[in-house]
């Protein structure tokens, strides 16, 4: 009888997870079906990574750092995609691989255990925000997958010690290896993992591996930065842009408030200090998501183009701030005002995110030229050009290649 009850319980849990996954998939497709029906190549995916394959070859492009950091995920997805699917199918590869990263990040609360999402209601609420809280700019492109990787890494940090085996460990391992080797966003969390590791009284082999992996990833990214800084000019690290840093930091930290307008921003800036006056809220174990959010907001403002920050840089911080607010509802020594304010804020945040979720025309305009071989145009000196997204006025995102390249990668 006990075995039967356990089997029924497992079946119930599996059914619940199945419907959550199906719902997430449906909401994702409904955002803009054209992302899946007519995939596009986004900006640096074409200009940097596909051009790198054309210039350096499949293997050479795998080890090439770009734009100040090494990006394993972008490199191997583009290289493998070009090898087996060519120019005709590469957009499908980058789109679906990016979608896989989004799904594995958004659904991670179902696998990772943490006091910050220790109930079904918390898990579902968090999954919903992680899905609809990402701006359209970071949606379904490998270039911005680093921000999903960063949030996943933060969720691993906030979870209980890793004791998984089998597919769960493979899942975490796949995401973490890609995360620390794809941009600086995840490797930047290495100090937090080291701090947690040193404080832990029991250290498992998996925790040892994750800390070593993050340190290795940080070293790779620092080396890539130094190498590119010496060999080329990286304008994004121009210290003269420091005058933009305060505004960039502000844009990143209030990115969770999708609503425009200074009023809501001001309310959040005023309320969080009020929340922190409570001793239980102020405790490190409860305020940790907010601490990491502030750290990432500052770091990403410094590393962003012109230090202006922006919505794509705010996604990890927004997810962490949402977790901080969600956790306030579980604290017992918090007054009624804080609880009520938190409920209202969470509803405002979810409502605002839902409104913005379907605003995708700025990154996918149906009138823009599709990424198809029929839209290739000829240039002088036997060169060919294929435009990629975005096709905003006064921009020229395009892949330039030779007819020999077309013959080689035309599948």
Predicted regions and their residues:
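Intrinsically disordered, polar/acidic, low-complexity terminal segments
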Residues: 2-135, 164-168, 195, 205-215, ...
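C-terminal TM-helix exit segments that contain a strictly Trp-centered aromatic cap at the helix terminus
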Residues: 220-230, 301-302, 355-359
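Low-complexity repetitive segments in secreted/extracellular proteins
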Residues: 231-241
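Short catalytic/ligand-binding loop motif for oxyanion handling, primarily in non-cytosolic enzymes
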Residues: 34-36, 135-140, 185-190, 224-231, ...
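Membrane-interface alpha helices of multi-pass inner-membrane proteins
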Residues: 168-193
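Membrane-interface micro-motifs in multi-pass membrane enzymes
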Residues: 71, 98-161, 181-182, 262-264, ...
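Transmembrane alpha-helices and membrane-interface helical segments
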Residues: 156-160, 189-197, 271-277, 318-334
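Alpha-helical transmembrane segments and terminal signal-anchor/GPI-anchor hydrophobic tails
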Residues: 232, 246-325, 354
